[in-house]
Amino acid sequence: MTHPKSARSTSALRKLALATCLLGASLTAHGADLADIKAKGVMTVATEDDYAPFNYIVDGKPEGFHKELLEDLTAYAKAQGFDVKQEILPWTGLLASVAAGKYDMAFTGALVTDDRLRVFNFAPPFASAQHFFAKRKGDDRITDLASLCGKTVGLQAGSALLARLPELKKMLAEHNCDVGQVMEYQSYPEAYADLANGRLDYVINALISINDLVKTRGDTFEKGFAVSGDGFAGWPIPKKSPELLEFLSGFMKEVRDSGRLAALQEKWFGEAFPSLPVEPITSVEQFHSLAGM
């Protein structure tokens, strides 16, 4: 399947959104917990529609991993007496809106990070977000870890991936070398364009994004190997909603045990992730332990 590439950005606007998120959480976070949701009969989830392969639009119709999983979540919720309402928002401001209590949860492909864990708990992860790299197809200069020494790398400015670049630096230090020039971009499509034209030697992104890039542009790029410890994608839940977190943990257990989660992972991400944590991620310390940081 071909689909449009998301320009989901981690620009200054995204940094501002995170700052707003942190401030909003400290002042006004009052998202409904499960008892309140059941009382009003509906859970409102914030999603986006420009982040393939999670949520995106093809010919005016929603597609993606979360489009299908939302159907399962709706059925699971109805069995417990309430409905699910979807609100589509741009990524910028989505987490801030959830933190401020305007929506009950973010139902999108959010990476677990230290900053976000200070505002949210995360339901059990639905995908790996370990960091891999893409290189130009046929570039035989890069074959192993040592061959990354001194090479120019591209990442998105302000991203979780940039924040974990020291892990690659530590790996390369064992080969008595370091990363080369680090180029920061406002969006990944810009970085991929510079990789294609030779300005970069490789680009680091989360595993699913690299898989999606190679799936849709395999004539230009190929997948490298992991350059970080484990990483995770999950749904952010306000910390003041522990019952909702428990509800979503139960939902994840159901789709995991039934094989539905693995089937959707294979379909949309190109591989299943049987070794993901099965518990919610609720603290920076727990995240670092799970990720081997």
Per-region residue spans from a language model:
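Bacterial N-terminal signal peptides that target proteins for export
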Residues: T2-A17
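Extended ligand-binding regions for polar small-molecule ligands
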Residues: G64-K78, D139, T143-S147, K151-A160, ...
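Acidic, polar ligand-binding/catalytic clefts
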Residues: E71, A75, D83-S147, F221-E222, ...
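Periplasmic-binding protein-like
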Residues: D49, A127-K135, L207, V214-K253, ...
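Extracytoplasmic small-molecule ligand-binding "clamshell" domains
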Residues: A32-T108, R118, E184, F247-L248, ...
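A ligand-binding cleft/hinge motif common to bilobed small-molecule-binding domains
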Residues: G93, G109-V119, R164-L172, P189, ...
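N-terminal signal peptide c-region/cleavage motif recognized by signal peptidases
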Residues: S26-A29
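Ligand-binding cleft/hinge of the Venus flytrap
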Residues: Y56, E71-D83, L161-E184, V214-G218
